[in-house]
Design a protein with these regions (language model features):
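Conserved acetyl-CoA-binding loop-helix of GNAT-fold acetyltransferases
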Residues: 102-107, 113-130
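Short hydrophobic/aromatic beta-strand or adjacent loop that forms the aromatic wall/cage
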Residues: 57, 176-181
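Conserved active-site alpha-helix within GNAT-family acetyltransferase domains
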Residues: 129-134, 142-172
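Conserved hydrophobic beta-strand within the GNAT/NAT acetyltransferase core sheet
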Residues: 102, 136-138
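Active-site beta-strand termini and strand-to-loop segments that position acidic
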Residues: 63-65, 183-186
Length: 186
């Protein structure tokens, strides 16, 4: 089994759709738009437009044996109104124009537990570093602190274990089960 990660560019749109799995058939699913503001008719259309217009790719695609297996959005934090405007996050984050953010780590069901999330986070760190980021942050779920087993959709932002395995460290918590994780890219 080989895991490769590539930039999510406009020509790879069919692979983006495939990476989203069953959610890919619903244009009103999140489509990695939860923390953005847009004026498109659907979230799917908004992501498509982003890929079409992006000078720097806004996401990465993971492939397992050449099949689309996962997606992550990795962009400058300042471009995410839902992150910058979040009061809980404002209390723990510094003002850093060169900080980037991983909003989601989506992995198709059949590829979970194979290291796809780690591969996406490793590639996200390289992508952010290559584009001038000083730090890369994320807000995963600490599944050990949950009272019940979460649904897969509740883990869209990744897990604490996944971020730790990729070399991120905890800088704060906004809730007992929600650490803010950081990788310094210096």
């Amino acid at each position: 089994m080989t895991i490769n990660v590539e930039s999510a560019t406009a020509p790879r749109w069919p692979d983006v759709v495939a990476a989203f799995g069953l959610r890919g058939s619903n244009p009103d699913s999140c489509w990695c738009q939860r923390f953005r503001e847009h004026d498109e008719s659907s979230n799917r259309a908004a992501l498509r437009r982003e890929l079409d217009e992006a000078e720097i790719p806004v996401g990465l695609l993971a492939y397992v044996s050449d099949q689309p297996a996962g997606w992550t959005r990795v962009v400058p934090r300042r471009t995410l109104a839902g992150i910058c405007g979040n009061r809980a996050l404002q209390r723990v984050l510094d003002d850093n124009d060169s900080a980037w953010w991983v909003t989601c780590v989506t992995i198709r069901k059949e590829h979970r537990g194979l290291g796809v999330g780690r591969a996406l986070l490793d590639a996200a760190a390289n992508h952010a570093r290559d584009n001038g980021a000083s730090v890369l942050d994320g807000h995963p779920v600490d599944t050990d602190r949950l009272k019940a087993k979460p649904s897969p959709s509740a883990l869209f932002s990744g897990t604490l274990a996944m971020f730790e395995a990729a070399g991120f460290h905890e800088v704060a918590r906004t809730y007992p089960s929600r650490p803010v994780m950081r990788m310094t890219l210096g």
